[in-house]
């Protein structure tokens, strides 16, 4: 099947609350890399109070926000937790960044109290003294090139044996000790990497698009568009 006959629908969850680190850049990257291939793409934004129908979505983005905003979002999402869980277990594609990453797990324990998580992945996060702030480079088996970004988080996330997004080559990662960053569960990626993540790492964007198309249409041959500018920017970050 020609990719020009395909369509991807991206759900951006709560951009009114979870857009602390420019997560709309991740949406823009996904859209562009679909359009460059002739794949029809649309983004639907779901803000507080909106009804979310996961059956109509191919990729879901959960961005980052403050602890207060995370608590508001989680309270809303817990009302449809079973639908979100079904989407994940059925292979639905999710990219969750920073606060969104923390919401995937069982809980986020902060100095102010406990934020209940969505329990979509068996992980948990606890706030500890000091923030982990630096450039970061990962070796991820999902893509061929190093994954680069910037991390800035006070929470330490523990994976309970789940697969990490990547091995830390430079930076702190999930907890500053394990040597790993992020989590991968089925077609879910959770990560602390900002940048935004996807414009800095177009291969990760293509991985998400590939998984979404395969879930919807079966086997797909995705030909990656080559962008010299993107590759040079990526190589510069990886060399830091």
Residue ranges: model-predicted function:
Residues 1-89, 199-232:
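N-terminal beta1-alpha1 cap of cysteine-dependent amidohydrolase-like domains
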Residues 230-240:
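Single conserved hydrophobic/aromatic residue that forms the stacking wall/gate
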Residues 67-140, 144:
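Cysteine-nucleophile active-site neighborhood
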Residues 43-45, 120, 149, 188-190:
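Conserved beta-strand scaffold positions in the cores of enzyme catalytic domains, especially
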Residues 2-3, 146-147, 156-232:
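C-terminal and late-domain segments of enzyme folds
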Residues 122-125, 149-154:
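Short, structured patches in soluble enzyme cores that scaffold and shape functional sites
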Residues 59-63, 95, 192:
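Structural motif
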């Amino acid at each position: 099947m020609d990719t020009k006959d395909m369509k991807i629908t991206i759900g951006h969850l709560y951009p009114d609350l979870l857009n602390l680190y420019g997560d709309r850049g991740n949406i823009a990257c996904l859209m562009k890399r679909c359009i460059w291939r002739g794949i029809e793409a649309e983004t639907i934004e779901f803000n507080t109070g909106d009804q979310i129908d996961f059956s109509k979505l191919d990729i879901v983005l959960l961005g980052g926000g403050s602890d207060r905003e995370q608590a508001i979002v989680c309270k809303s999402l817990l009302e449809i937790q079973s639908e979100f869980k079904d989407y994940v277990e059925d292979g639905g594609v999710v990219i969750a960044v920073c606060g969104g990453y923390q919401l995937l797990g069982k809980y986020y324990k902060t100095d102010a109290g406990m934020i209940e998580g969505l329990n979509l992945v068996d992980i948990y996060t606890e706030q500890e003294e000091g923030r982990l702030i630096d450039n970061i480079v990962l070796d991820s088996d999902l893509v061929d090139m190093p994954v680069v970004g910037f991390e800035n988080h006070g929470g330490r996330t523990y994976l309970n044996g789940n697969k990490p997004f990547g091995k830390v080559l430079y930076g702190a990662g999930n907890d500053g000790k394990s040597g790993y960053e992020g989590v991968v569960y089925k077609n879910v990626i959770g990560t602390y990497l900002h940048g935004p993540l996807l414009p800095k790492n177009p291969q990760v964007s293509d991985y998400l698009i590939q998984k979404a198309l395969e879930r919807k249409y079966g086997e797909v041959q995705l030909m990656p568009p080559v962008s010299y500018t993107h590759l040079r920017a990526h190589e510069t970050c990886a060399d830091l």
